């Protein structure tokens, strides 16, 4: 056997980084990484507080799935985001905190879009009629339940103004619409900060129907003071 070294023509060929196969493989890895990052951000990453809400989420096209942990007033509640729901283990592998300390800095305060409920007693002012009924209704309707929210904006109190939908035995229901239907709120009156998505006309028709039927707060007739006017008094 000859001990002479291999000639240059007999050496193993090297593969250039510009070889089409190398470029194709690199593009595949880059694309997979980009897709993974996108899917994680859109479907897996938890939105813990309003600070996690990006412009891409606040465009009215993204929905967040989670659980209502506390109802604070007639038109707002605390929301714990559970991306992926039971498919990603929420409720059986991943526990939702149930204590105030466990939920600290882990929830969104959601303000229902398009609706204003009667004001409860605070800042030395008495409660409006039907404020307690509105609170109890919202607690029974969404309290402890899984809901889907569509965020629109963040208000001056760092609340997420959003559409909320919940599954009931009659199907998926719009929470703001159901409050208006039952006369437990009015269409939001402020000149700024109002959010309706694409439902303003629908909400106004529901309010008018409840008014004609004297449902809830509309049973007060001429004595009714809307929440907006009450806050300005």
Curated annotation (Swiss-Prot):
- Where's it found, cell-wise? Mitochondrion; Membrane
Which residue spans adopt a coiled-coil conformation according to this UniProt entry? none
Write down the Gene3D superfamilies for this protein, in alphabetical order: 2.40.50.90
State the protein's name. Answer: Probable endonuclease LCL3
TM helices/strands, residue ranges? 22-44
The record describes its membrane topology as: Single-pass membrane protein
Recorded hits in PANTHER family, A to Z, give: EBNA2 BINDING PROTEIN P100, SERINE_THREONINE-PROTEIN KINASE 31
InterPro entries hit by this protein: SNase_OB-fold_sf, Staphylococal_nuclease_OB-fold
EC number(s) stated in the UniProt entry for this protein: 3.1.-.-
Species annotation: Clavispora lusitaniae (strain ATCC 42720) (Yeast)
Q: Tell me which PROSITE patterns the record gives.
A: TNASE_3
Q: Which gene encodes it?
A: LCL3
Q: What keywords is this UniProt entry annotated with?
A: Calcium, Endonuclease, Hydrolase, Membrane, Metal-binding, Mitochondrion, Nuclease, Transmembrane, Transmembrane helix
């Amino acid at each position: 056997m000859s001990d002479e070294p291999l000639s240059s023509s007999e050496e193993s060929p090297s593969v250039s980084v510009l070889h089409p196969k190398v470029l194709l493989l690199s593009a595949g890895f880059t694309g997979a990484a980009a897709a993974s990052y996108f899917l994680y951000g859109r479907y897996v990453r938890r939105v813990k507080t309003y600070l996690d809400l990006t412009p891409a989420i606040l465009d009215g096209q993204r929905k967040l799935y989670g659980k209502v942990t506390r109802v604070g007033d007639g038109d707002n509640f605390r929301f714990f985001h559970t991306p992926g729901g039971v498919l990603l283990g929420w409720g059986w592998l991943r526990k939702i905190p149930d204590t105030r300390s466990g939920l600290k800095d882990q929830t969104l305060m959601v303000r229902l879009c398009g609706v204003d409920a009667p004001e409860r007693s605070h800042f030395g002012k008495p409660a409006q009629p039907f404020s307690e009924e509105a609170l109890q209704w919202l607690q029974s309707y969404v309290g402890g339940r899984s809901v889907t929210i569509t965020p629109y904006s963040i208000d001056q109190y760092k609340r997420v103004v959003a559409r909320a939908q919940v599954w009931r035995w009659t199907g998926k229901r719009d929470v703001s619409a159901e409050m208006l239907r039952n006369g437990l709120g009015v269409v939001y009156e402020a000149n700024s900060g109002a959010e309706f998505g694409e439902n303003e006309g629908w909400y106004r028709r529901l309010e008018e129907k409840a008014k004609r039927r004297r449902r809830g707060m509309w049973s007060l007739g001429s004595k009714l003071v809307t929440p907006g006017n009450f806050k300005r008094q």
